[in-house]
Amino acid sequence: MTAMNSNFSYPALGVDGISSQISPIRDVWSTNLQQEMNLIMSLIERYPVVSMDTEFPGVVARPLGVFKSSDDYHYQTLRANVDSLKIIQIGLALSDEEGNAPVEACTWQFNFTFNLQDDMYAPESIELLTKSGIDFKKHQEVGIEPADFAELLIGSGLVLQEEVTWITFHSGYDFAYLLKAMTQIPLPAEYEEFYKILCIYFPKNYDIKYIMKSVLNNSKGLQDIADDLQIHRIGPQHQAGSDALLTARIFFEIRSRYFDGSIDSRMLNQLYGLGSTGSVLWHNNSSTPQIQFRDLPGAHPSPTPSNAGIPTTLTNTSSAPNFANSTFRFPPRVV
């Protein structure tokens, strides 16, 4: 990428003297999905940098057994949860390689169908999202079907294109939910296969958290990094559109401030918390591999399809909101 120019800006942000008459974040439901995807398709060639965030219903399951490494455990935790849960929001923010956003629109927040009566979730996650302004009644009534979104996304020019760069923050779960929607099958049994598929659909991607930790030894969350850089958030925290827009602005700021306008290619296609190899075996409370679900109120997990490759032995745990007896957990994503 080229260095960010001096005119870096996002339209209508409502801060630093920029007009706020038009919101930069466009809500997308089933009723306007085709219209908004058409707009994105008309812009992607000129604005081929896509910053992305998702909101999902928490973490409700963990694998038990023997694992090749801690990274293997982290991936199996991700896999068990993504295969069992439904996405709630996806946020996408477009810009060009200098960080300029389109005038027509710059950020889209896709809202997916979700039913609090039928779909599984972690209660504390839903409570947080509700406090952040997510309208679950509307999600139930006019939310987007993931398959409909995926069909349009595959043909949009955003994925399967080496010319498009994806920017994320602690993005293992984000990409996993997108891949699940596009492939319509459970995630691969092994991380190596997941990574191969990831690089087909998203051949060029940067994870800001990986970059900050690897180069600057900074493991702060998205909001804390924004505060350090004095970047103002637009929209509510813990909503995908706002987080995607903030991700975009942080990326171009750190690229300019710390990397002289060009990030080392070694940072490309690395996911924070996943991917390093190791031969040591990791144990987690059981000699028999299985998936352990939290004992949640309301909806309960359905057995994983046999072709998923995930062990389908389910065990109830206590109703406590954490896995106190778990040796490892996927690093919590802090925003």
Swiss-Prot record:
Residues 305-325 have a biased composition (Polar residues). It comes from the Eukaryota. It is found in: Cytoplasm; Nucleus. Binds 1 Mn(2+) ion per subunit. Binds 1 Zn(2+) ion per subunit. At lower physiological Zn(2+) concentrations, Mg(2+) replaces Zn(2+). The nature of the bound ion affects the speed of the RNA degradation reaction and, to a limited extent, base selectivity. Its EC number is 3.1.13.4. Mg(2+) binds at residues 53, 55, 174, 243. Its main location: cytoplasm. Gene3D superfamilies: Ribonuclease H-like superfamily/Ribonuclease H. It catalyses: Exonucleolytic cleavage of poly(A) to 5'-AMP. InterPro entries: CNOT7/CNOT8/Pop2 (IPR039637), RNase_CAF1 (IPR006941), RNaseH-like_sf (IPR012337), RNaseH_sf (IPR036397). It holds the Pfam family CAF1. Its cofactor is Mn(2+); Zn(2+); Mg(2+). Zn(2+) binds at residues 53, 55, 243. Keywords: Activator, Cytoplasm, Exonuclease, Hydrolase, Magnesium, Manganese, Metal-binding, Nuclease, Nucleus, Phosphoprotein, Repressor, RNA-binding, Transcription, Transcription regulation, Zinc. GO terms for biological process: nuclear-transcribed mRNA catabolic process, deadenylation-dependent decay; nuclear-transcribed mRNA poly(A) tail shortening; regulatory ncRNA-mediated gene silencing. One of its GO terms (molecular function) is mRNA binding. The modification Phosphothreonine is found at residue 304. The modification Phosphoserine is found at residues 302, 306. GO terms for cellular component: CCR4-NOT complex; CCR4-NOT core complex; cytosol; nucleus; P-body. Residues 292-325 are annotated as: Disordered. Acts as the catalytic component of the CCR4-NOT core complex, which in the nucleus seems to be a general transcription factor, and in the cytoplasm the major mRNA deadenylase involved in mRNA turnover. In vivo and in vitro, caf1 has 3'-exoribonuclease activity with a preference for poly(A) RNAs. Belongs to the CAF1 family. This is Poly(A) ribonuclease pop2. It comes from Schizosaccharomyces pombe (strain 972 / ATCC 24843) (Fission yeast). The lineage of its organism: Eukaryota, Fungi, Dikarya, Ascomycota, Taphrinomycotina.
